């Protein structure tokens, strides 16, 4: 399958043949597992001190005194038990808890291939919430000169020429302050995802693009399901460079 390649001003440059990965079957179940696997891989096992709440001289006086048989200090205050001040926890976190979603290597690659193919389907991309009115084609491939852009203003000009600016505005307007404790824990804002830029190798465009609202930049070799299907939802609006398409040929 061939698609158009566009210059930085939005004009057509020519055609490029897409890798076979863009024809992969859509498997939302595999995509979800792969993304959850990537998310849970960041979790850290948690436990507590094995003697937490046990370090006390309190003891029970036994039955026959008309009071609960909990361990008590010399002053008569309850200790050791979960309902007592300074007592142990009833069900503390265990390091043995299984936190990670395991996935086979071939399944993970199949999920990535499926997510890449979904990013070329206008119905799936639109259903995810992206604004694609006026976008010349999906998948959207741009001239490799894009990777040499060093200014955010220049990148924004390319996005405007390719009609991607509407999706940037959607992401910018969608930034909201979260409710609850998240505000106190370094994740105050909910930030929608907009365009994913896939480049061939590390380049100037990486730093120039990532300051735009909702935009992420990744190299073709580092691309995974969590980038192209964030939140387990496939169909992210993606801008590919010519060199990124060539790298996909070698990866799949």
Swiss-Prot record:
Instruction: Indicate the secretion signal residues.
Output: none
Matching entries from Pfam families are given as: Ribosomal_L4
Indicate whether RNA-binding appears among the record's keywords.
yes
Cellular component terms (Gene Ontology): ribonucleoprotein complex; ribosome
Assigned keywords, A-Z? Ribonucleoprotein, Ribosomal protein, RNA-binding, rRNA-binding
| GO process annotations (BP) | translation
User: GO molecular-function annotation terms?
Assistant: rRNA binding; structural constituent of ribosome
Gene3D superfamilies (alphabetical): 3.40.1370.10
Q: What does this protein do?
A: One of the primary rRNA binding proteins, this protein initially binds near the 5'-end of the 23S rRNA. It is important during the early stages of 50S assembly. It makes multiple contacts with different domains of the 23S rRNA in the assembled 50S subunit and ribosome. Forms part of the polypeptide exit tunnel.
Tell me how this protein assembles: Part of the 50S ribosomal subunit.
Protein name from the UniProt record:
Large ribosomal subunit protein uL4
